[in-house]
A protein has these predicted regions:
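Generic alpha-helical secondary structure signal
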Residues: 7, 31, 64, 116, ...
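Cell-surface, membrane-associated systems
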Residues: 74-191
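Aliphatic-rich helix starts adjacent to a transmembrane/signal segment
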Residues: 13-66
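Alpha-helix initiation/capping motif
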Residues: 10, 47, 51-54, 153-155, ...
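N-terminal leader/signal peptides at the extreme start of proteins
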Residues: 1-15
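Short Cys/His-centered divalent metal-binding micro-motifs
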Residues: 69-70
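Generic detection of intrinsically disordered/low-complexity segments and helix-coil linkers/edges
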Residues: 2, 21, 54, 106, ...
Length: 191
């Protein structure tokens, strides 16, 4: 069969091999880019979720500590993590103290310290009563206490500054660093 110009019509119309290869290549590139973007978004979601869990946990721990410290007295900055004395003692220079002891509103001696990358609360100087205040997901690498104004008659209201540094996340790829600082002053008027 001839068309009007005199050439034969292509009765076997279709797609050539080169066209198929180009189409498959374009699809493969698009699929690879989409898969990479999906993996990246999944990692970002895991990082945000881990960070949120740890921030909520640390916020709860610091709020709990703050409420109890605020109503306490006899602030004592410990020289090591096993210093459970409740006699007033300042430590206002770097690196601060690794533990903090005070007498709470019920008359109990409370110590906060860092032990095995977790914040512990110890009642009446007995390590057997240690209450772990942070989740395993929150790895605390530094917990320092700076106490000012704890001795009587120094004309300063007792206060403690808590500095906390840690990491959130289990996988190295999605770990986030956390730095928190808070200052708490004693409610009782210092004598």
């Amino acid at each position: 069969m001839k068309d009007k110009i005199g050439k034969f019509k292509n009765i076997f119309g279709g797609i050539s091999l080169i066209e198929i290869l180009i189409a498959v290549s374009i699809f493969a590139v698009a699929a690879t880019i989409s898969a990479g973007a999906l993996m990246s978004m999944t990692d970002a979601q895991q990082k945000v979720l881990a960070l949120r869990i740890v921030q909520d946990n640390l916020s709860y721990a610091l709020d709990t500590m703050g409420k109890e410290i605020r109503t306490g007295s006899s602030y004592h900055c410990g020289i090591d993590i096993n210093d459970f004395l409740a006699t007033p003692r300042d430590c206002s220079v770097f690196p601060g103290g690794p533990s903090f002891t005070f007498i709470n509103s019920l008359g109990d001696t409370i110590t906060y310290r860092l032990n095995n990358n977790r914040i512990e609360k110890i009642l009446n100087g007995n390590p057997a009563t240690a209450l772990i205040m942070t989740a395993p997901d929150a790895v605390i690498v530094l917990l320092s206490f700076y106490v000012v104004g704890s001795p009587a008659n120094d004309e300063l209201q007792p206060r403690v500054t808590i500095i906390l540094k840690g990491t959130a996340g289990i996988k190295e790829k999605i770990k986030s660093r956390i730095n928190i600082q808070t200052t708490i002053s004693q409610r009782l008027i210092d004598s």
